[in-house]
Curated annotation (Swiss-Prot):
Family stated for the protein in its record: Belongs to the bacterial ribosomal protein bL34 family.
Basic residues bias spans: 1-14, 31-44
CC terms in the record's Gene Ontology section: ribonucleoprotein complex; ribosome
One Pfam family recorded for the sequence: Ribosomal_L34
Region entry Disordered, spans: 1-44
Single GO biological process annotation from the record: translation
Record's protein name: Large ribosomal subunit protein bL34
InterPro entries listed in its UniProt record: Ribosomal_bL34 (IPR000271), Ribosomal_bL34_CS (IPR020939)
Amino acid sequence: MKRTLGGTTRKRQKTSGFRARMRTASGRRVLSARRRRGRHRLAV
């Protein structure tokens, strides 16, 4: 039997998507830190 370790897109977006990050102050801090660092992708 196969394991369910594929990961679900909905869960991933809900927890670490761009809009999820924008929702909280700490999430916005994460985004600004990633911008400062020059990350190509800000969120998942």
